[in-house]
Amino acid sequence: MDSIQQRRGGIVSLSPAQTPRSSDKSARESRSSESNSTNRNDKEKGVNVQVILRCRPLSEDEARIHTPVVISCNENRREVAATQSIAGKHIDRHFAFDKVFGPASQQKDLYDQAICPIVFEVLEGYNCTIFAYGQTGTGKTYTMEGGARKKNGEFPSDAGVIPRAVKQIFDILEAQGAEYSMKVTFLELYNEEISDLLAPEETIKFVDEKSKKSIALMEDGKGSVFVRGLEEEIVSTANEIYKILEKGSAKRRTAETLLNKQSSRSHSIFSITIHIKENTPEGEEMIKCGKLNLVDLAGSENISRSGAREGRAREAGEINKSLLTLGRVINALVEHSGHIPYRDSKLTRLLRESLGGKTKTCVIATISPSIHCLEETLSTLDYAHRAKNIKNKPEINQKMMKSAVMKDLYSEIDRLKQEVYAAREKNGIYIPKDRYIQEEAEKKAMAEKIERLELQSESKDKRVVDLQELYNSQQILTAELSEKLEKTEKKLEETEHSLFDLEEKYRQANATIKEKEFVISNLLKSEKSLVERAFQLRTELESASSDVSNLFSKIERKDKIEDGNRFLIQKFQSQLTQQLELLHKTVASSVTQQEVQLKHMEEDMESFVSTKSEATEELRDRLSKLKRVYGSGIEALDNIAVKLDGNSQSTFSSLNSEVSKHSHELENVFKGFASEADMLLQDLQSSLNKQEEKLITFAQQQRKAHSRAVDTARSVSKVTVEFFKTLDTHATKLTGIVEEAQTVNHKKLSEFENKFEECAANEERQLLEKVAELLANSNARKKNLVQMAVHDLRESASTRTTTLQHEMSTMQDSTSSIKAEWSIHMEKTESSHHEDTSAVESGKKAMQEVLLNCLEKTEMSAHQWRKAQESLVSLERNNVASVDSIVRGGMDANENLRSQFSTAVSSSLDVFDAANSSLLTSIDHSLQLDNDACTKVNSMIIPCCEDLIELKSDHNHKIIEITENAGKCLLDEYVVDEPSCSTPKKRPIDIPSIESIEELRTPASEELLRAFRDEKLSKQANGDAKQQQQQQQQHLIRASSLYEAAVSDSRYPLSAVN
């Protein structure tokens, strides 16, 4: 009792991985989850229902009789083609689905490609539904449940969607290491009654099964549907679910039909609810809920083909009714109807959320490839193809906090405790009185039944002993008779062979006679039918001939009336011709008048054109004068531009001469510097030569005693030579710098000349458009150009000056370094040769004199370089002043030319304004002439319009007169043929159809013989030979009628026979 209460009420310990609830609480929570869901995924709104099609292979019986296949599946293109024969033509209908699986597909292929993603979405928190739909015997239950489990517990290869989904769910949850709880429900819908397949088996069965109350289907206020009192099994492993599934499937109602040996007679819904615990970043524990509904629908069936009778027929009717309601719901959803008939069936109420609701739905449509099931297959394909267009709006279920779940569970436990206390108040299990009486009666009946079965068992045991003894005696007798039987069989075979030959000959002769009689009877019957039909046709021909004579008389009367009408029409034609000629004359006179007026208008237009040409000539003369005035102004501007060009060229030439003069003066200055430097070097060389002679003499005197002094003197001589070589290289560098500066100046002057010429050319081109503005811009550009050139010259001069200063400083540094080296050398010589002081003093004095002479020469060269620098600076200042004076003179000349140009422009503008005013007066005069010409033309057009109006009125009167004459002739005088009532009325003629004529023809003899032989074989199979001989004539007549109905389409036409 406690285990039953634990399963029903869900009273278990509240571990983190298990949060079970009772059935009522589950329904309330599911409704709350649907109404309060806030975690919506915008991408999943408006998702179409996924439709998968699966075609089963041919059964063994179908393959044995070679049943034609009318369904072809293209899995790559996801398309199904159904071959249908209409009016003798084969027509293929194509249907496209989300996934297509042909007869060769396996359970694993279907699950991996179509169902596996749906299971992942369930674990993400969605509600998903998978249901199989199709005709009975097409494999719905096999697809959903698969084959039976193996005894060793291995997972079967042909497992269906439900066991594979369960296995995948547990594998994923175990791999993630998640804390979860799972519960399942399994219900059955049979004859519109819901029963729980997981309800516990009670020890006492109900006497009448109909007295068992079905489970109630309830709705909340928000449109959701839930089943009250449904059992929920809490599971923790996949094997538990497999056992529950086997137990529930065993309780389902199944029966054998002609189409399926084990056909499901009810709909089943297997639901799996999963609660998964998650931890938020804030550390709170949340419960995520997902639900998977796996629906196995009962198949629609044709009662005539399934062989259902009585109770089974009622079951089939209820199944077809619920599936028909499902089809109506699908049609209404696809057509967006205002009313969806969910409440017409409990099946559609249960699937309400799956069709157009918040659930992700997958439909597996199963079909048969056999031609015998083509009608049901096409119906399934149409409904499945329509279901593709249903749009659901799936939403993720709201995550619940663990504390809220535990609070609800505690309140549920308190409620169940109160119910248990109320039930056990009276020291035992309390049950109703009626139930107790019923159970006692059933116990008594059960005891009586057990006694009766025991008696039957004893009697059957005695009978078994007797039968065993009889069996032993029969075995001995069988062994004796078997030998006799073998001998008798050999004789029998010989006799049978001879008898078979005689019977075969007799049968052939008798069959030939009967066949001839059958053919003759059919020929006589056809002859009689032909004679009767010929008499009928003769009667129809006589009545038709009388009708033809009456028609000829009517045609003669109509000819007379037509002759009178033809004369009347000719008379009307002559009158109409006369009136049209009169109308033509009137129109011709009006046209001549208009031609005269047009001639007058033409003359006026010619005078207008001559006046207009004179005014045009006058305008042309004025324009030529204006052109001459404009040309004179342009010539004046050209003269000013020429003067400006001359002034610019003179300015540039003076500037060029000044620059060349500056370069010549600079060259002369550097030549003077070079000559002075050469003289200085020559003096130094001569002094050095003298010093060398003195040193040689001194060395010869002191060679023996002072060899080290000679070496030192040689080193001094080397240093001095190097110094003068350095001085020579610096002088060479100075000469190169001067030449480089000269070339740079020439290059910049040439660039300045090119820029000046380009600027002058541009100004000359632009002076004609914007003279005043461009003159100011020209002066500014020229001033900038000259300033830039002067600036460049200054920079080059300053650069050269700095270069010269650098060379001078380098020379001074080298001189000072040599001086320092010399002093060091003297100190060393003085310290090392102290003992030779007397001899060295004379040489020292001479060397001091030479050194002083060298210092004087050095100071003199430094003075010369300073003078050169000062002269360069003064030359630069003079050059800048001269260039500034030249530029100022050019700017003053350009200013004078600009004033002259502005006066010339103003005078040209005055002349142009005067010419423009005179041109405007001439244009006004021309416009006045145009207005005068328009008034004259209007004065001519007005009388023309009046004449046209008068002509229009006369033309209308003539037309009215012609219309009256036509009506009088064609309506009053025209004779109409009156009916004489002698014309034969239309009556239906009994024309024999081609089918009736074909029915009169006797079938071919081969066909008659074939039908006769078939009828004879069927009668022989029934073993009624005597009755066949007595009723031979009746059988022949029946075989003839059957033959005519069978071969009516293949008869020859009667014309071909004749």
UniProtKB/Swiss-Prot annotation:
Function: Responsible for microtubule translocation. May be important for the organization of phragmoplast-specific arrays of microtubules. Plays an essential role in stabilizing the mitotic spindle. Required during mitotic cytokinesis.
Residue spans of biased composition, Basic and acidic residues class: 22-32
Cellular component terms (Gene Ontology): cytoplasm; mitotic spindle; spindle microtubule
Binding-site residues for ATP, renumbered to this chain: 134-141
UniProt similarity note: Belongs to the TRAFAC class myosin-kinesin ATPase superfamily. Kinesin family. KIN-5/BimC subfamily.
Alphabetic keyword roster: ATP-binding, Coiled coil, Cytoplasm, Cytoskeleton, Microtubule, Motor protein, Nucleotide-binding
Domain Kinesin motor: from-to ranges: 48-390
Location of this chain's protein in the cell: Cytoplasm, Cytoskeleton; Cytoplasm, Cytoskeleton, Spindle
Source taxon at top rank: Eukaryota
GO biological process: microtubule-based movement; mitotic spindle assembly; spindle elongation
Pfam families on file: Kinesin
Protein name as annotated: Kinesin-like protein KIN-5D
PANTHER family, per the entry: KINESIN-LIKE PROTEIN KIF11, KINESIN-LIKE PROTEIN KIN-5D
GO MF assignments: ATP binding; microtubule binding; plus-end-directed microtubule motor activity
PROSITE patterns: KINESIN_MOTOR_1, KINESIN_MOTOR_2
Statement: the UniProt record of this protein carries the keyword Nucleotide-binding: yes
Ribonucleoprotein keyword on record: no
Region span, Disordered: 1-43
Coiled-coil ranges from the UniProt annotation: 438-517
InterPro entries named in the record: KIF11-like, KIF11-like_kin_motor_dom, Kinesin_motor_CS, Kinesin_motor_dom, Kinesin_motor_dom_sf, P-loop_NTPase
